[in-house]
From Swiss-Prot:
Subcellular location: Cell inner membrane
Keywords, ordered alphabetically: Cell inner membrane, Cell membrane, Membrane, Transmembrane, Transmembrane helix
Pfam families given in the database record: DUF697 (PF05128)
Gene Ontology cellular-component terms listed: plasma membrane
Membrane topology: Multi-pass membrane protein
Biased composition (Basic and acidic residues): 1-19
Residues passing through the membrane, by range: 70-90, 100-120, 213-233
Protein name in UniProt: UPF0283 membrane protein YcjF
Family statement drawn from the similarity comment of this UniProt entry: Belongs to the UPF0283 family.
Segments of this protein annotated with the region Disordered: 1-35
Classification via HAMAP family: UPF0283
Upper taxonomic lineage: Bacteria, Pseudomonadati, Pseudomonadota, Gammaproteobacteria, Enterobacterales
Native source species: Salmonella choleraesuis (strain SC-B67)
């Protein structure tokens, strides 16, 4: 049997057209625009370390505030007044042939000259530190640049500042690897992979040595005051040593401020990182039960010294970290624990003999 025909259905709305994707208009760039093109830099810094990193950056980057300018202006006027008064006293002493007063003026001139020299030296170190921060920003821009011509001169300047001789094997390999067709990003990248690791390896060795000394000193010393003085002195030496390796000098005030702020940030903002880095090894190997309280304090002091060295290393480097080459506390943790265990075993075996 045939089925009956269905009635007609009328639709009031028209048929909907299929949506078509809208294409953007084609954009063409000239050769000059393509050379100056640079992608936006992405900040890959972890959010949990933002406060600590910003505080330590402020310690190394000198600030320019209105109060500082006013103080500097007042000191300049005071210095000019002292110089003018000294010249007047010298002229009067010479005219009256007052040799005692003339000798006092000469001694005062020597003291003022020494003070001016110290101020100039401190200003020069602060200026050099500020230039290092600018160089790191410039290197970050070159690592994202496709232009040609600036990378080689920039890297040669960095090598000269670091005291790397032209005949150094790493620098010779870099010269052999670069050619005229490479852009600044490739040239600076090759320098970061061939030459910069030479200085980084020296800085890592210094951090390991100072951290090991701090660990052993705290572990074997019974005097807390001596421990504090030793750690403070060695950490200041570590900062100076790392800065010297990278070709810069830290000023007196910036060095002390860096040391204070880094310790504060390590003790508070960096506590979570220390627990994350060290907690697993301590729990897995049951080191908390094997080591004494002084030994545990020694490991903590060594890790604090290592973190201080890593931060000083980061802010004294002329290049930013790339390809996850930043040293971590885990790189020094096992070494410190191994050295401490060897020292404790030797100290236990020596009385038995």
């Amino acid at each position: 049997m045939s089925e009956p025909l269905k009635p007609r259905i009328d639709f009031a709305e028209p048929l909907k057209e299929e949506p078509t994707s809208a294409f953007k208009a084609q954009q063409t760039f000239s050769e000059a625009e393509s050379r100056t093109f640079a992608p936006a830099a992405i900040d890959e810094r972890p959010e949990d370390e933002g406060v600590a990193e910003a505080a330590v950056d402020a310690a190394l980057r000198p600030k320019r505030s209105l109060w500082r300018k006013m103080v500097m202006g007042g000191l300049a006027l005071f210095g000019a007044s002292v110089v003018g008064q000294g010249l007047q006293w010298t002229m009067n002493a010479w005219q009256t042939q007052d040799w005692v007063a003339l000798g006092g003026c000469a001694a005062g001139a020597l003291i003022i000259g020494a003070g001016v020299g110290s101020v100039v030296t401190e200003w020069r170190r602060l200026w050099r530190l500020r230039q290092r921060a600018h160089e790191r920003d410039e290197a970050r821009e070159l690592l994202h640049s496709h232009s040609v011509g600036k990378g080689r001169a920039f890297c040669e300047k960095l090598a000269q500042q670091a005291g790397i001789d032209q005949s150094h094997p790493a620098l010779q390999r870099w010269y052999a690897a670069i050619h005229e067709t490479q852009n600044d990003r490739e040239v600076v990248g090759l320098y970061a992979h061939l030459v910069q690791p030479v200085l980084d390896a020296q800085a890592r060795r210094e951090i390991s040595r100072f951290a090991a000394e701090s660990t052993l000193m705290i572990a074997v010393s019974p005097l807390a005051l001596v421990d504090m003085a030793f750690i403070a002195w060695r950490n200041l030496r570590l900062i100076n040593r790392i800065a010297t390796l990278y070709g810069i000098e830290l000023g007196y005030y910036s060095r002390l401020r860096l040391f204070r702020l880094v310790l504060l940030n390590i003790a508070f903002a960096g506590a979570s990182e220390l627990v994350r880095e060290v907690g697993m090894d301590w729990m897995s190997q049951d080191l908390a039960a094997r080591l004494s309280t002084r030994a545990a304090q020694g490991i903590g002091a060594g890790l604090l010294t290592a973190r201080l060295g890593i931060k000083a290393m980061e802010l004294c480097r002329p290049l930013p970290w790339i390809d996850n080459d930043k040293p971590r506390l885990g790189d020094f943790r096992r070494q410190l624990i191994g050295q401490l265990k060897e020292t404790l075993q030797k100290s236990k075996s020596s009385p038995e003999k």
